[in-house]
């Protein structure tokens, strides 16, 4: 309870809604550089001092001056691994911090190098077989043009060098709010159109015009008979013989007993086809009788006859038959 009260007392008096979230350039310019110049006198309400080698990362949020944020800032001094060496000790009791990637250069006004940022990840266990965690640290330090020098002996009264101080930002990667992944709505399979048939909106009118221009217009004389005419034809053929005769040539006109009706350029057969063949057989029989009686009958030039020619042929056949009967009667007597 007493520790929580101390944490509340350490909180800076800021209006609601204010957050401490400086940029990399602001951290170097306004917080790290003044601390290096006056390490004892310079103090910031939002950044506390901590020894990272004696604290585990999950304990650091409780030691921050601004509690309740998703990232925490600390001043820390580098702990040399060896008194006369250059390597930094980054181990704790539970694990160690391991650098990852290259250091990032920080510029002022995009041309003046003022600092460097190093990214480290905390591993549980001992190197090199530690288990990686989601705790991440950004370590900010001033840029030094001169090569690094080993620290002075502990007996010296010389103040700490500028590369001994750093600003560390600690955060946990899983604590950030991730944006939900929006899955695009897909059309059902039966509603999807193949890619080959999808027409862009810009070319739709042009393609429709080309398609309409490519449609072949069927003339009236080439159109098929209507459904009612086809049914009538089937009805007429069904009343005739079971074996329907082959259709006559297209040049046929109207014949006795088997007229042809022209309707919109389509030829339709009307009547009983057997009547046409019976009449043809009768005409052939009459011609044979006339040839046997001594009459010379020439073969018709064409099977296509008009109604008037067919009537004349019938009258001629009747007259010839009467003449044959009269001749037979004369010769009989």
Swiss-Prot record:
InterPro entries membership: NAC-dom, NAC_dom_sf
Chain ranges of the NAC domain: 14-173
Pfam families attached to this UniProt entry: NAM
Disruption phenotype: No visible phenotype under normal growth conditions. The double mutant nac20 and nac26 exhibit a floury grain phenotype due to decreased starch and storage protein content.
Keyword annotations: DNA-binding, Nucleus, Transcription, Transcription regulation
Statement: the UniProt record of this protein carries the keyword Nucleus: yes
Biological process annotations from GO: positive regulation of DNA-templated transcription; regulation of endosperm development
Subcellular location: Nucleus
Compositional bias per record (Pro residues), positions renumbered to this chain: 147-157
GO MF terms held by the record: DNA binding; protein homodimerization activity
Record text on subunit structure and interactions: Forms homodimers. Forms heterodimers with NAC20. Forms heterodimers with NAC23.
Name used for this protein in its record: NAC domain-containing protein 26
Lineage, highest ranks first: Eukaryota, Viridiplantae, Streptophyta, Embryophyta, Tracheophyta
Gene behind this protein: NAC26
